[in-house]
Amino acid sequence: MEKGLTLPQDCRDFVHSLKMRSKYALFLVFVVIVFVFIEKENKIISRVSDKLKQIPQALADANSTDPALILAENASLLSLSELDSAFSQLQSRLRNLSLQLGVEPAMEAAGEEEEEQRKEEEPPRPAVAGPRRHVLLMATTRTGSSFVGEFFNQQGNIFYLFEPLWHIERTVSFEPGGANAAGSALVYRDVLKQLFLCDLYVLEHFITPLPEDHLTQFMFRRGSSRSLCEDPVCTPFVKKVFEKYHCKNRRCGPLNVTLAAEACRRKEHMALKAVRIRQLEFLQPLAEDPRLDLRVIQLVRDPRAVLASRMVAFAGKYKTWKKWLDDEGQDGLREEEVQRLRGNCESIRLSAELGLRQPAWLRGRYMLVRYEDVARGPLQKAREMYRFAGIPLTPQVEDWIQKNTQAAHDGSGIYSTQKNSSEQFEKWRFSMPFKLAQVVQAACGPAMRLFGYKLARDAAALTNRSVSLLEERGTFWVT
């Protein structure tokens, strides 16, 4: 038998041992690799899980992500593939949600911050808080406010109130002195705010006699507000029920305050005229109230014309003036009468100066209008006022203006709103004694200069139609 080459026993043992060790080494390397892979996988799962756990439940609800995709019932982690899928889905929906909410990515957010900073450095623009406007026609008696108020009363989508603060003046009394004006202004302002919010019930505390079951026959000048005399506010007429201030063109039952408040809320806009708001600064809380979008139109008129009109309309209050005019002697007018006239002019002037200074809270919310400009161009001024208020002017209002400003004769009564406006506004010049005009010019000089009313040097200039007592003014009246 042939003998082959054989390795020594020691070598064979060594080779066999090496093979066995190699197998164990390979197995050990495999185990280490698997262990490292599992550890990495666990770390990834842990990070994803932590991310998911940190997301508020509200966001999951907001973007309709199923919570079951995030955590299992037993709070254990799902497989990596399921978690990756859930996390990707959630991330996508969060992105969509952020876009819907106006939240931009970091770079876009930084751009927005720069844009906001740029806007803050720009002058404030006219307020555009919302579609509903709250227009206040701020005036004094005998300035033509009833006539100008009709520009808003005749528009069907505006709820208009005529002098609602009249009831407060008749009911609330204040101590005489300097606090009187401030105290009354605060009450007027607070009532005004509630009225703009269509809380007409606030008037029930001031109407005399007190309304019963929200019904009253004593709403001041109800007939001057179309909104209070149209359906459904105009309820069936009740026989033998006397209504002091009744509707003009139809017969209605007592005013139902609840129905009036509901009608106010249904209208697109709200407007009212008030001759008892004297200090513009008291309206700042209303201008800053987020529930309101206030527009103030201050109506002024030549103080000489105002006094001439008041002496006719309120003759009983001006007996002292008439006696002074009729007195051929040298006795002067009582100083307290002149001081009262001067105080009225100054309060009007100070409010106008505040509005024209354009403080931030009033910017875009104030307009100064001269009655003389309205009388000379009523349709043009109506369009300007509506543009300022942010309300479209309807043909209905334009037709009313055309018909009621070109009448052959002024309407009857001292409160008539039917006028030949282009001729009417200067009638006072031919009936006022020059010495009365001199008193007004001396007491109201600063206000007259601000509003562009020229002084009459003598009686001839006062009655000369070819001599204008009105300066032409530009568009600076709107701020």
Curated annotation (Swiss-Prot):
EC numbers: 2.8.2.17, 2.8.2.21
Function: Sulfotransferase that utilizes 3'-phospho-5'-adenylyl sulfate (PAPS) as sulfonate donor to catalyze the transfer of sulfate to position 6 of the N-acetylgalactosamine (GalNAc) residue of chondroitin. Chondroitin sulfate constitutes the predominant proteoglycan present in cartilage and is distributed on the surfaces of many cells and extracellular matrices. Catalyzes with a lower efficiency the sulfation of Gal residues of keratan sulfate, another glycosaminoglycan. Can also catalyze the sulfation of the Gal residues in sialyl N-acetyllactosamine (sialyl LacNAc) oligosaccharides.
One GO CC term, this protein: Golgi membrane
Protein's name according to its UniProt entry: Carbohydrate sulfotransferase 3
Compartments, as annotated in UniProt: Golgi apparatus membrane
Gene: CHST3
Entry's family note: Belongs to the sulfotransferase 1 family. Gal/GlcNAc/GalNAc subfamily.
Sugar-bearing residue positions: 63, 74, 96, 256, 420, 464
InterPro entries registered for this protein in UniProt: Carbohydrate_sulfotransferase, Gal/GlcNAc/GalNAc_ST, P-loop_NTPase, Sulfotransferase_dom
Any one Gene Ontology BP term: carbohydrate metabolic process
Topology term for the membrane: Single-pass type II membrane protein
Cytoplasmic domain ranges by topology: 1-20
Record has Transmembrane helix as a keyword: yes
Transmembrane segments: 21-38
Phenotype when changing residue 304 to Q: In SEDCJD; loss of chondroitin 6-sulfotransferase activity
Tissue expression from the record: Widely expressed in adult tissues. Expressed in heart, placenta, skeletal muscle and pancreas. Also expressed in various immune tissues such as spleen, lymph node, thymus and appendix.
Annotated positions binding 3'-phosphoadenylyl sulfate: 141-147, 301-309
GO MF annotations in UniProt: chondroitin 6-sulfotransferase activity; N-acetylglucosamine 6-O-sulfotransferase activity
Species assigned in the record: Homo sapiens (Human)
Phylogenetic lineage: Eukaryota, Metazoa, Chordata, Craniata, Vertebrata
Span list, region Disordered: 108-128
Pfam families: Sulfotransfer_1
Modification comment: N-glycosylated.
Keywords assigned: Carbohydrate metabolism, Disease variant, Glycoprotein, Golgi apparatus, Membrane, Signal-anchor, Transferase, Transmembrane, Transmembrane helix
Residue ranges annotated as Lumenal topological domain: 39-479
